[in-house]
Amino acid sequence: MKIAVIGGGSWGTTLADLAAKKGLDARLWVREQAVMNEIRSSRENSWYLPGRKLSDQLEVSTDPAAVAEGVSHFVFAVPCQFIRAAYQRFIKYLPKNAVVICASKGIELDTLMTMSQVCQDALASIKPRFAMLSGPSFAYEVIREMPTAVTLACKDKKAAKDVQEALSTPYFRIYTTTDVRGVELGGAIKNIVAIAAGVADGLGFGGDARAALITRGLHEMSRLGKAMGGDRQTFMGLSGMGDLVLTCTGDLSRNRQVGLRLAKGQKLLDILADMKMVAEGVKTAEAVHALGQKLGVEMPITEQVYAILYKDKDPSKAVYELMTRDLKDE
């Protein structure tokens, strides 16, 4: 299998390195000439993965045509608000019926489209076979070959099986499903809940509060997922509960770090300016808040996170309002 990974951040570089080490013909497209030069000369992406030697077999380029030549499988690993632009950049190099694997988690803010909807819209002329790769996975751990399990969602079962077999390793295990909508929504919404969990941790609350947020966040995820055609059972799996637990508890979680710093009184713009990588939950909170209102789905955690991020709401007041909502059955 020839595979091209689009995006030279930590996750894109990690997936490309994994594919190359597995023995696949793997190419990595990066935007910056300096990143390409560094990987070619020292086999390192020091900005995102300092100290990690990349496979000597991994090809890297800033030229879309060179990266895409002869390739049938494309992994897009760029921040979700830029995924449409990445599709548009590569559309003339993608073959008809190409397998397009999205490794970005979120909702497009301008359109409120999920990642699969953006793909089908932007790449309609080539009729891609879309797959969503999601689940509890920090690039920091995968690049170090620590055991990780993820989910690949694709309507085309053969395409899913091919990718599963091609990319699974003794340390990176891929499960498959046909529930694309459920998997992509789980990966998006968990980042919002992680911001809330970070806020709770930053305010000095304990494990009780974190457990409540994770559990009620899962309910929130399932409600919106069902309204949008996802299978509720999917949210009990790796791309739902698994990713939710990791992102709400892991010190490597960028979204949790945003919540922690907001609770300490830091301003959102200052936090984002100080981060090397994108915290997807910030824009996703705005998009999911709008989706919940549009579909009439109750999203209390999302509403409070949105208010903290965009209405300058005091985090302590947001927690108080969550805890004093009308009492109800579980």
Curated annotation (Swiss-Prot):
InterPro entries attached to this UniProt entry: 6-PGluconate_DH-like_C_sf (IPR008927), 6PGD_dom2 (IPR013328), G3P_DH_NAD-dep (IPR006168), G3P_DH_NAD-dep_C (IPR006109), G3P_DH_NAD-dep_N (IPR011128), NAD(P)-bd_dom_sf (IPR036291)
Enzyme nomenclature, EC number: 1.1.1.94
UniProt keyword terms in alphabetical order: Cytoplasm, Lipid biosynthesis, Lipid metabolism, NAD, NADP, Nucleotide-binding, Oxidoreductase, Phospholipid biosynthesis, Phospholipid metabolism
Residue positions binding NADPH: S10, W11, R31, K105, A139, R254, V278, E280
Active site residues of this protein: K190
Binding site for sn-glycerol 3-phosphate: K105, G135, S137, K190, D243, S253, R254, N255
Highest taxon listed in the record's lineage: Bacteria
Catalytic activity entry: sn-glycerol 3-phosphate + NAD(+) = dihydroxyacetone phosphate + NADH + H(+); sn-glycerol 3-phosphate + NADP(+) = dihydroxyacetone phosphate + NADPH + H(+)
Pfam family, one: NAD_Gly3P_dh_C
GO cellular component: cytosol
Main location: cytoplasm
Keyword Nucleotide-binding: yes
Gene Ontology biological process terms in this record: carbohydrate metabolic process; glycerol-3-phosphate biosynthetic process; glycerol-3-phosphate catabolic process; glycerophospholipid metabolic process; phospholipid biosynthetic process
Pathway: Membrane lipid metabolism; glycerophospholipid metabolism
Function: Catalyzes the reduction of the glycolytic intermediate dihydroxyacetone phosphate (DHAP) to sn-glycerol 3-phosphate (G3P), the key precursor for phospholipid synthesis.
NCBIfam families: PRK00094.1-2, PRK00094.1-4
Protein name: Glycerol-3-phosphate dehydrogenase [NAD(P)+]
